[in-house]
UniProtKB/Swiss-Prot annotation:
Listed GO biological process terms: phosphorelay signal transduction system; positive regulation of DNA-templated transcription
Consequence of gene loss (knockout): Disruption leads to loss of motility due to the failure of the mutant strain to express the RpoN-dependent flagellar genes.
Sigma-54 factor interaction domain boundaries: 136-365
Role: Member of the two-component regulatory system FlgR/FlgS that induces the transcriptional induction of the genes needed in motility and flagellar biogenesis. Upon phosphorylation by FlgS, functions as a transcriptional regulator and activates transcription of RpoN-dependent flagellar genes.
Identification of the protein by name: Transcriptional regulatory protein FlgR
TM region positions: none
Residues with PTM 4-aspartylphosphate: 51
All residue ranges annotated as the Response regulatory domain in the record: 2-113
Single GO molecular function: ATP hydrolysis activity
Gene symbol of the encoding locus: flgR
This protein's UniProt keywords: ATP-binding, DNA-binding, Nucleotide-binding, Phosphoprotein, Transcription, Transcription regulation, Two-component regulatory system
């Protein structure tokens, strides 16, 4: 197993190198910063272990640029709940706060190694379905109230802002609103503001004419135009660069765009749904988000409760995911023991549905018996 360690602290980096030298089945390549790692990472690597707080580029931005190509583990000396949640959102398998026992990190590495080896031996005929992005897997009183609000606003053209923690299902709600609207037969286009580098975001949204910049060898339609007559979903809207917010405000108000390198405006007919897990009042007070744009986008706010407030959904979602994974990998039927079920119900799920689905998939693969035990979940309570 080939592992990249990205750590700016030379003492920590050397300590990990020395510790892992004792493991004959692990090949370690260390980097002092994400930039060096990005230049060298290739298909031969299986796992990336990265710090978060590093100069020039932090670990979370580094992971976003990797786009899930590698399994990942985060180590940091300044852990916060928000960083842990952001890590889960980016698909990080484990999160260690310094100082930590290297033996625990090693255990996490070998769990990941076992999953990767299993997946290589049992390649899927087709990727696991992701129904959580397009439909609701379970029901609860809190969820039904949010669905009622979404259904009511779907028949209108009002802009909607979906509020809630990362992983609660905001994209599911965006699809739900689109599917129950008069625009359902037209495009639904989603764009994550934090997933596209800032220097590319404007051209992706607005499009460009030939010659607008060095690499613009042909005209390209932007996402706003592509969504015409349909819905555009602006995920993580709070991360939109400030200088682009004024341009978005004009699009929302005037329903027209101008491609880069052009002086001619184009009318568009789109419905805006945005989503965020940020405190927008704080963003506005800090002058990181325009208040006028906020009011234009949040005509109808819908708050989606976190999974820990929708406890009755946890086991149904877990059981659906467990069956899906077992069927996909031909593992035979598996179930949760009473203790495992109790653990799932009592865990806080700061990563919400996204975290739950990942935990269940890992447990299904790693468990040796037909009944998944609490120890197979690897959840700290």
């Amino acid at each position: 197993m080939k592992i990249a360690i990205v750590e700016d602290d030379i003492n920590m980096r050397k300590s990990l190198e020395l510790f892992f030298e004792l493991q004959d089945d692990l090949e370690i390549v260390s980097f002092k910063n994400p930039k060096d790692a990005l230049a060298k990472l290739d298909e031969s690597f299986d796992l990336v272990i990265t710090d978060i707080n590093m100069p020039h580029m932090d670990g979370l931005e580094f992971l976003r640029l990797l786009e899930g190509k590698y399994e990942s583990i985060v180590i940091t000396g300044n852990a916060t709940l928000n960083k842990a949640i952001d890590s889960i959102r980016l698909g990080v398998k484990d999160f260690f706060q310094k100082p930590f026992k290297p033996e625990l990190l090693l255990e996490s590495i070998y769990r990941t190694k076992k999953v990767l080896e299993f997946q290589k031996k049992h390649p899927l005929e087709k990727p696991l379905k992701k129904p959580h992005k397009h439909s609701f897997l379970a029901a609860s009183k809190a969820l039904e109230e949010s669905k009622r609000q979404a259904l009511k606003v779907a028949s209108t053209d009002a802009n909607v802002m979906l509020l809630g923690e990362s992983g609660v299902g905001k994209e599911v709600f965006a699809h739900f609103i689109h599917q129950h609207s008069q625009r359902s037969k037209h495009p639904f286009i989603a764009i994550n503001m934090s997933a596209i580098p800032e220097h590319l975001l404007e051209s992706e949204l607005f499009g460009y004419q030939k010659g607008a910049f060095t690499d613009a060898t042909a005209p390209k339609m932007g996402l706003f135009e592509s969504a015409n007559k349909g819905t555009i979903f602006l995920d993580e809207i709070a991360e939109m660069p400030l200088q682009l917010q004024s341009k978005l405000l004009r699009v929302v108000q005037e329903k027209e765009i101008t491609r880069l390198g052009d002086n001619k405006s184009v009318k568009i007919d789109v419905r805006f749904i945005s989503a965020t897990n940020a405190n927008m009042k704080e963003k506005i007070a800090a002058k990181e988000f325009r208040e006028d744009l906020f009011f234009r986008l949040q005509i109808v706010p819908i708050t989606i409760a976190p999974l820990r407030e929708r406890v009755e959904e946890i086991l149904p979602i877990a059981e659906i995911k467990l069956k899906e994974v077992c069927d996909a990998y031909h593992l035979g039927p598996k179930s949760f023991s009473k203790n495992a079920a109790k653990c799932l119900l009592e865990y806080s799920w700061h990563g919400n549905v996204r975290e739950l689905l990942g935990v269940v998939e890992r447990a299904a693969i790693l468990s040796e018996e037909t009944e998944i035990q609490e120890k197979d979940l690897f959840l700290e309570r």
